[in-house]
């Protein structure tokens, strides 16, 4: 029935395209009407459209005419030289109907899927122009600085011709330059530049003059799937150096390396014994049928299963797994030990190891034997694995009658410090083990100039300046024997998911989005529209070729390269890591095939390498760097011989990455071909392939070196990829659910901070803080539920110590309710503060004269105090939230939902944060004293130093400079 309705009414995509096509026809009609206009008259259309918008006409109504204006300008500029990245090239683009269709979809808030070479960059100009007519902020977000600069210079020339201003955000631009850029009608930049400016404006800027952004109205995200999905779990973090080094990484790195080496030696021994035993039974090609022999072989396979849990990449294990029957036996043991009834036997087997490595979930676990080895031989401590029960410890202290109240407090402080040290040591130990067992050099990171540089797993690009969080970066530095730098402290953070939700309107464009349409809809409320191609794609997509072993696969790849290279086709070979690209490069050198390598180690030559990749006979080996955002243009000779030939050395866990690699060839009607080579040793195949696939290869194993190639295998691979994508989507959605809690708190704090910065008079905000603090303290200390009881003297003592002020207890005793007492205390505090404020104004006026705005100076002092304590307490809160997030998962043991627990406890933490901010602000305001000096100063400069009363160590001095017109004698 559903299929019948689709055939009758058309799919949702078809109906949307049909509706937008009517608007395309209107655009073309307006384009003809604009043809007779002079250049000046066409430019004036921008002024006219802006005026019409201000008078109430909607953007939707103006869309056909505005898009026609852009199209007409493109036609008029044909042949005009444009400088792009230092080179001159003639403008030669006029939007096709399919590009106009895509532009309409972007304005309507769609993600447009347009194939490589279909002109996404030009398509974006039309919605950018239309939305910039509002005068509100309009941004185009790219994946790197180069593309932002290129697009601004190239297609931005259309916008500038029409009288709009354009700017490009480049990393490292100074404050004043960035403010000027944000004032432009259209701003180009990377997601991180826009995101970090948002964080700086809301966490570092202390005045309106230091804030650069002007809001979030409309954004188009280029390569939207990369930014909103691949990078969604990577938060933007502004951080600074921590207060001190964690000595754990120095102390434990050699001990951890020794424990991992013991594990490696144990697994090597088990694997070698199993291989020798197997060689006695069979020639590794034909499995015997004798039952006793098979049982013996099965026992050796059990040992290899154990090796797979200790060192999954063991060479002997990988060699044995090339035999389909032996692979099946090892997998059979895996299934056997996963059964609930065999759990105890599984634990007994795994107890032989020191560490259990879970490659599938990228995790590990120390066994009892590993812990014992750590204590007995590695010089570790049993306390490294035991956390203190703080409730029990505090209870013991409270019940110890021999301790005085002061001793109990000191003992609790000591216990708390010991608990903190134990947790830090245990955390450092775990991160050192993670670095040794799960983080691979030239896969997850590279080592350069005494530094660890992260490699982006999706793009293959180096990420200098980024660091793994939670001490993992220091652990890798210890592993690789480079300088171990201080752990960073987070000042501000936001995920890209929540940052882009700030925009009133959001759109995107990419060549690969339809496979993630569900996630775009559920997370961002964005629909995906597949835009038809202008020219038919001529790419030949060959079936994947499957080989039993990695060795056979590489042999086949080299043969394919040699064959295609002989015909003259340019070849692009895509690899999944730096390690694989270098390995393949060595093989090609041995076979005397000239080639160029592009990976994270030589990314500086990217533009030069890509420019030559489309030439006749070129061979380029590249990581995922060449899979997205790169446009390989063919020379005429390469087109004649059949275009670019793309070879994939493995399938990525995401289908989109594979589609991006295929999309490098056959752009805009050019010829091209793509083929992927896989082996059953590839990570995707080992961890996520269907059991059906293993059964098939057991029955249909081809001769050595011969490929298996069939659409059925392609389907099975796609199923494995879907399984991984579903798992990753669940992880991203789960992460977002937690970050949504943090996001609400972030927005509340940032709103309060901005209110302080932008308010001309912060005095009412200070009074409000004083009011809340006095209510809270008075209610707490005078409460009958409080341990001190209903005690006004206690209240007086606390107020005198904290602020300090003296209360009129006789007046308070006349009041009969706690609310009345709290209100009276609040009024008294506010009155004292008003008097203090007036005194400060008088002091400054006396010192600097009437020409100085003394009230303004005092307001600036109050503003600085308030912002300082918001920032300090927020940093502490971020640490507390991280700790809560890492610990809350353990609540599942008590049959509790971690997310609900996180929401509940984070709310309590936030209440505590607000309380601590108010108390810190009020304490500081009441302890302020002004010091006026003129010694060794220019005649008209008077420093005003606001210091804390009684030299409180929590509040340092702040100095403001007052420029006075008065002479020195006044």
Curated annotation (Swiss-Prot):
It is found in: Cell inner membrane; Cytoplasm. Keywords: ATP-binding, Cell inner membrane, Cell membrane, Cytoplasm, Membrane, Nucleotide-binding, Protein transport, Translocase, Translocation, Transport. Transmembrane segments: none annotated. One of its GO terms (cellular component) is plasma membrane. One of its GO terms (biological process) is protein transport by the Sec complex. It is a peripheral membrane protein. GO terms for molecular function: ATP binding; protein-exporting ATPase activity. InterPro entries: Helicase_ATP-bd (IPR014001), Helicase_C-like (IPR001650), P-loop_NTPase (IPR027417), SecA (IPR000185), SecA_CS (IPR020937), SecA_DEAD (IPR011115), SecA_motor_DEAD (IPR014018), SecA_preprotein_X-link_dom (IPR011130). This is Protein translocase subunit SecA. It comes from Chlamydia caviae (strain ATCC VR-813 / DSM 19441 / 03DC25 / GPIC). The lineage of its organism: Bacteria, Pseudomonadati, Chlamydiota, Chlamydiia, Chlamydiales.
């Amino acid at each position: 029935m559903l299929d019948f309705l689709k055939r009758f009414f058309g799919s949702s995509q078809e109906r949307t395209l049909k509706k937008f096509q009517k608007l395309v026809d209107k655009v073309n009609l307006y384009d003809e009407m604009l043809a007779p206009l002079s250049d000046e008259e066409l430019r004036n259309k921008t002024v006219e459209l802006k005026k019409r918008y201000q008078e109430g006409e909607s953007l939707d109504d103006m869309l056909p005419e505005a898009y026609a204006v852009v199209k007409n300008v493109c036609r008029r500029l044909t042949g005009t030289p444009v400088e792009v990245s230092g080179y001159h090239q003639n403008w030669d683009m006029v939007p096709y109907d399919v590009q106009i269709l895509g532009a309409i979809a972007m304005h309507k808030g769609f993600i447009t899927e347009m194939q490589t070479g279909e002109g996404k960059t030009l398509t974006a100009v039309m919605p950018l122009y239309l939305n910039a007519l509002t005068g509100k902020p309009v941004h185009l977000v790219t994946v790197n600085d180069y593309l932002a600069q290129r697009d601004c210079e190239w297609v931005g020339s259309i916008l500038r011709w029409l009288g709009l201003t354009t700017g490009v955000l480049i990393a490292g631009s100074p404050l004043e330059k960035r403010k000027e850029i944000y004032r432009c009608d259209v701003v180009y930049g990377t997601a991180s530049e826009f995101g970090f400016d948002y964080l700086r404006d809301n966490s570092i800027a202390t005045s309106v003059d230091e804030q650069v952004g002007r809001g979030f109205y409309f954004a188009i995200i280029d390569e939207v799937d990369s930014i909103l999905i691949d990078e969604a779990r990577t938060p933007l973090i502004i951080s600074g150096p921590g207060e001190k080094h964690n000595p754990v990484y120095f102390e434990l790195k050699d001990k951890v390396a020794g424990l991992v080496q013991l594990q490696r030696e144990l697994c090597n021994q088990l694997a070698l014994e199993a291989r020798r035993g197997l060689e006695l039974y069979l020639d590794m090609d034909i499995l015997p049928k004798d039952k006793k022999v098979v049982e013996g072989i099965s026992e050796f396979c059990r040992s290899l299963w154990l090796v797979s849990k200790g060192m999954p990449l063991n060479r002997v294990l990988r060699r044995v797994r090339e035999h389909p029957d032996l692979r099946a036996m090892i997998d059979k043991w895996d299934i056997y030990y996963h059964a609930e009834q065999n759990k105890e036997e599984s634990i007994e087997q795994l107890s032989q190891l020191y560490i259990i490595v879970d490659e599938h979930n990228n995790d590990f676990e120390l066994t009892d034997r590993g812990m014992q080895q750590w204590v007995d031989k590695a010089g570790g401590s049993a306390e490294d694995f035991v956390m203190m029960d703080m409730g029990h410890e505090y209870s013991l202290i409270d019940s110890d009658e021999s301790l005085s109240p002061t001793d109990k407090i000191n003992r609790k402080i000591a216990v708390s410090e010991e608990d903190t040290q134990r947790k830090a040591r245990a955390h450092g130990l775990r991160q050192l083990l993670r670095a040794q067992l799960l983080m691979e050099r030239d896969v997850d990171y590279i080592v350069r100039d005494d530094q660890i540089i992260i490699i982006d797993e999706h793009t293959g690009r180096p990420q200098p300046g980024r660091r793994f969080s939670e001490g993992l970066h220091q652990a890798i530095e210890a592993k690789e024997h480079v300088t171990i730098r201080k752990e960073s402290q987070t000042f501000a953070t936001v995920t890209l998911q929540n940052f882009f939700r700030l925009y009133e309107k959001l759109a995107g464009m990419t060549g690969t989005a339809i496979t993630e349409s569900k996630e775009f809809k559920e997370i961002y409320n964005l629909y995906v529209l597949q835009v038809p191609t202008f020219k038919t794609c001529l790419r030949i997509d060959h079936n994947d070729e499957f080989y039993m072993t990695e060795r056979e696969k590489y042999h086949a790849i080299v043969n394919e390269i040699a064959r295609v290279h002989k015909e003259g086709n340019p070849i692009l070979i895509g690899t999944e890591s730096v390690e694989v690209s270098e390995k393949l490069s060595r093989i090609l050198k041995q076979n005397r095939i000239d080639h160029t390598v592009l990976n994270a180690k030589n990314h500086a030559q990217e533009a030069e390498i890509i420019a030559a990749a489309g030439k006749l006979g070129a061979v380029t080996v590249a990581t995922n760097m060449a899979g997205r955002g790169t446009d390989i243009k063919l020379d005429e000779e390469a087109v004649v011989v059949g275009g670019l030939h793309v070879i994939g050395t493995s399938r990525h866990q995401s289908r989109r990455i594979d589609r991006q690699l295929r999309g490098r060839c056959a752009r805009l009607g050019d010829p091209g071909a793509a083929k992927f080579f896989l082996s059953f040793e590839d990570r995707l195949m080992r961890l996520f392939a269907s059991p059906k696939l293993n059964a098939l290869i057991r029955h249909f194993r081809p001769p050595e070196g011969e490929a298996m190639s069939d659409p059925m295998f392609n389907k099975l691979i796609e199923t494995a990829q879907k399984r991984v994508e579903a798992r990753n989507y669940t992880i991203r959605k789960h992460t977002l659910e937690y970050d949504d809690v943090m996001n609400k708190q972030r927005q509340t704090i940032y709103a309060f901070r901005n209110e302080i910065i932008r308010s001309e008079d912060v005095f009412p905000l200070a009074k409000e803080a004083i009011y809340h603090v006095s209510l809270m303290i008075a209610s707490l200390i005078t409460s009958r539920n409080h341990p001190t009881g209903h005690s006004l003297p206690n209240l007086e003592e606390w107020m005198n110590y904290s602020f300090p002020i003296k209360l009129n207890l006789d007046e308070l005793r006349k009041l009969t309710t706690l609310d009345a007492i709290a209100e009276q205390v609040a009024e008294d505090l506010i009155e004292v503060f008003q008097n203090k404020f007036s005194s400060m104004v008088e002091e400054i006026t006396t010192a600097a004269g009437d020409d100085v705005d003394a009230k303004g100076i005092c307001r600036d002092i109050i503003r600085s105090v308030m912002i300082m304590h918001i920032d300090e307490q927020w940093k502490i809160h971020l640490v507390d939230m991280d700790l809560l997030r890492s610990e809350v998962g353990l609540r599942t043991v008590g049959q509790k939902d971690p997310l609900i627990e996180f929401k509940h406890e984070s709310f309590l933490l936030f209440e505590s944060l607000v309380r601590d901010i108010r108390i810190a602000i009020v304490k500081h305001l009441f302890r302020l004293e002004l010091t006026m000096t003129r010694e060794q100063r220019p005649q008209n400069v008077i420093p005003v130093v606001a210091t804390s009363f009684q030299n409180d160590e929590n509040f340092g001095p702040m100095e403001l400079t007052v420029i006075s017109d008065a002479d020195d004698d006044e």
